[in-house]
Amino acid sequence: MMTRRAQRNTAGRSTFGIDRMVRNVETGRFERSLSALTAAGALVTAAEIFFEHDSASFGNKMMWVPVVLGPVGAAAGVAGFFSRRMAKTALPVASAAIVANGLQGTCLHARGIAQKPGGWKNARYNMEMGPPLLAPLLVTMVGGMGLLAAVLRREK
């Protein structure tokens, strides 16, 4: 059982840690954190894309691009977490490629819906049964996180 004084000290330290994190975010100092989140998001998103594109049998060779870019973004995010230089060079390059591929994927998914029987005239059905129109924007958001991390300052 902790004494009252020990409880106050523990609570004070955890509050200080949270306050410091909030202060870093308020002042735009969360480059390392956002780099790590970009790395995690890139891996999770790449795995999800792999499973979805695998169920479509990778019918278009372009389906492999976001699967390959996921680990590249993750490696750049981890490098950006440990190195300021990598956060300012490798991370924005990888993130820009991910954003471009996400926008391209949105166009390809829209084209896939248009090619279904009835096309956009039967949009409700084709959006449910065809390629998910907004799913590529998820990978675009992960790339955007990496671009944002590159312009922020490192935590104190």
Where are the regions that the model predicts?
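Short amphipathic, positively biased membrane-proximal segments
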Residues: 1-156
